[in-house]
């Protein structure tokens, strides 16, 4: 049977961070650990989770897996030839001897300066409330970024003027440069610094962008925040980065989320935790208590004899997984609260309870004032 995708096994996206990988592994390993989960198949599930984590938590193994999958080299099911086996020349980019001499002399073969290039990627940090992260929302943001000049439409020249042959390189787009090296004086070619390799220069530069072809502006964007995003997660807005060069595509905008903590719940991945204080009578006799969930309030049955530390699990009452893998759970942690102030009647009843339980209570004062009273009374 074919192996499942490691990212699918852990329930994470392919661009998940190390923290997201670790968090997903901890949650799943705790759920399917053979010492905890006795269901059939839990052991195999745990092995699958551990194998996925072993690969994705290691940068080298993860890179190899992303490139080759389960059947590629580096122990994922097959041994194949990899260009990295010739590691002796990797420091020069694997481009052969021309690139070795290019790196040595700082010149040599150059990239085509007129080739199209993708624009730079940008990053924006968005702060969300707990509720916005859980249920999703749409927010408008304002960012400063380079955009194509509206005056010259990215050409760089003043409208109505034309370009002429570069006076520095005579239209070649590159110039000869001589350098002193350990092997003597070497002649190389470099991109023309005046026309940046285009071979042309403006008769008159655009008055708005001064020949750059771009201008820096404040841009408003609408960002749709998906349900279930967590702190430090990010989404990619394709084409919303800086404009490309020479007709290349624009870069992307990455929106990174900072999620404020909830005053009611504690979050761990898709699971949420709620602390519930119960009184001594409620814990001893049992009760039904109304508790909050993400969407409404539900009744929770507290069995008689419940102790501090008891945890109740409400399945699928947690947060929707941002990648669509169901819902997390709501865990209710119980704390039995000891009363700090009792009426005389309540004290009598407590003493009577202790006597019926075969206990002899040596009552102690609760504060300095009570202790002082007992001292002066000679008790």
Curated annotation (Swiss-Prot):
ZnF start-end (CR-type): 136-218
Subcellular location: Cytoplasm
CXXCXGXG motif repeat feature ranges: 149-156, 166-173, 192-199, 206-213
Amino acids binding Zn(2+) 2: 166, 169, 192, 195
Domain notes: The J domain is necessary and sufficient to stimulate DnaK ATPase activity. Zinc center 1 plays an important role in the autonomous, DnaK-independent chaperone activity of DnaJ. Zinc center 2 is essential for interaction with DnaK and for DnaJ activity.
Residue span, J domain: 5-69
Subunit field text: Homodimer.
Cofactor binding, note field: Binds 2 Zn(2+) ions per monomer.
Family, per entry: Belongs to the DnaJ family.
InterPro entries to which the protein is assigned, alphabetical: DnaJ, DnaJ_C, DnaJ_domain, DnaJ_domain_CS, HSP40/DnaJ_pept-bd, HSP_DnaJ_Cys-rich_dom, HSP_DnaJ_Cys-rich_dom_sf, J_dom_sf
Domain of life, per lineage: Bacteria
Annotated binding of Zn(2+) 1, by residue: 149, 152, 206, 209
One Pfam assignment: DnaJ
Stated name of the protein: Chaperone protein DnaJ
Disulfide bonds: none
Origin species: Staphylococcus aureus (strain bovine RF122 / ET3-1)
A molecular function GO annotation: unfolded protein binding
Alphabetically ordered keywords of this record: Chaperone, Cytoplasm, DNA replication, Metal-binding, Repeat, Stress response, Zinc, Zinc-finger
Function: Participates actively in the response to hyperosmotic and heat shock by preventing the aggregation of stress-denatured proteins and by disaggregating proteins, also in an autonomous, DnaK-independent fashion. Unfolded proteins bind initially to DnaJ; upon interaction with the DnaJ-bound protein, DnaK hydrolyzes its bound ATP, resulting in the formation of a stable complex. GrpE releases ADP from DnaK; ATP binding to DnaK triggers the release of the substrate protein, thus completing the reaction cycle.
Cofactor list: Zn(2+)
GO cellular component: cytoplasm
Predominant localisation class: cytoplasm
Record-level GO BP terms: chaperone cofactor-dependent protein refolding; DNA replication; protein refolding; response to heat
């Amino acid at each position: 049977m074919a192996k499942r995708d490691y990212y699918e096994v852990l329930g994470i996206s392919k661009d998940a961070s190390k923290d997201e990988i670790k968090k997903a592994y901890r949650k799943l390993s705790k759920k399917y650990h053979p010492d905890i989960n006795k269901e059939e198949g839990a052991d195999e599930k745990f092995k699958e989770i551990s194998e996925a984590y072993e690969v994705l938590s290691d940068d080298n193994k993860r890179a190899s897996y992303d490139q080759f999958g389960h059947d590629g080299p580096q122990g994922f099911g097959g041994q194949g030839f990899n260009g990295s086996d010739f590691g002796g020349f990797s420091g020069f980019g694997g481009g052969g001897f021309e690139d070795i001499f290019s790196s040595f002399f700082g010149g040599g073969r150059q990239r085509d300066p007129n080739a199209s290039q993708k624009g730079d990627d940008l990053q924006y940090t968005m702060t969300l409330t707990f509720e916005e992260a859980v249920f999703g929302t749409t927010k408008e943001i304002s960012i400063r970024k380079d955009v194509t000049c509206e005056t010259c439409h990215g050409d760089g020249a003043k409208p109505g003027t034309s370009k002429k042959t570069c006076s520095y390189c005579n239209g070649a787009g590159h110039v000869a440069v001589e350098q002193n090296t350990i092997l003597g004086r070497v002649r190389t070619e470099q991109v023309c610094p005046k026309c940046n390799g285009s071979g042309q220069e403006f008769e008159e530069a655009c008055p708005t962008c001064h020949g750059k072809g771009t201008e820096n502006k404040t841009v408003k964007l609408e960002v749709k925040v998906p349900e279930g995003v967590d702190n430090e997660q990010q989404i990619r807005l394709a084409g919303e980065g800086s404009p490309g060069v020479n007709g290349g595509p624009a870069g992307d905008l990455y929106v990174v989320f900072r999620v404020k903590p909830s005053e009611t719940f504690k979050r761990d991945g898709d699971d949420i935790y709620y602390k519930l204080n119960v009184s001594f009578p409620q814990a001893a006799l049992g009760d039904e208590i109304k508790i909050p969930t993400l969407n409404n309030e539900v009744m929770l049955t507290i069995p008689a004899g419940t102790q501090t530390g008891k945890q109740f699990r409400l399945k699928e009452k947690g947060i929707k997984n941002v990648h669509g893998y169901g819902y997390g759970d709501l865990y209710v942690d119980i704390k039995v609260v000891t009363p700090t102030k009792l009426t005389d009647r309540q004290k009598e009843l407590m003493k009577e309870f202790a006597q019926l339980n075969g206990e002899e209570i040596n009552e102690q004062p609760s504060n300095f004032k009570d202790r002082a009273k007992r001292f002066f009374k000679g008790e």
